[in-house]
Amino acid sequence: ENVGAHTLVGEGVGARAAQADPLANPTTEADDIEIFGYLGTKSTAASPGDSAKQTAVKVNNLTGETGVKAYAKTYASIESTSAEQKTYSVKINGFTTGNFVISSGDVESAVDAINQVSGSTGVTASSSNNKIVLFDSDGDDITVENLQTLDGFSDLRVSKLGEDGLVSNVVG
């Protein structure tokens, strides 16, 4: 008999450097997700560009046949590498924040600005150790674009976070 709860945490694709056309997740049409549950085993196709949310939906469509239920959450962080306070604006999932001031020792203005657009982005922000922690509870991808184009404004670093909050990939 199979009794108990099992958790599989997949860290997914790391943060990517800025570019005109974002990269899709590195899967091919031939990739399958195999689901081994107490009710049975099933496979579902993984598609290029699937978010964690889309993958969880595919797994959950087979819950009745496998007994496996999936959830998806997405975490990322933004930090400034400059001790000097600078004014930025960013796009989160295509929605522009208001201007905020950020430094390596102060992120509260940025957290407030990001949370002002959270109803549109699905991403909430909090602060931890002078970093902005971004969270999407549905597992949608989180995109961040620095809108400040002046010289000397390249201090923001975006990192992919695992569910444990630890940095697993840095871009910037």
Question: Which role does the model predict for each range below?
Answer:
Residues 1-172:
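Long, low-complexity, repeat-rich, intrinsically disordered, solvent-exposed domains used
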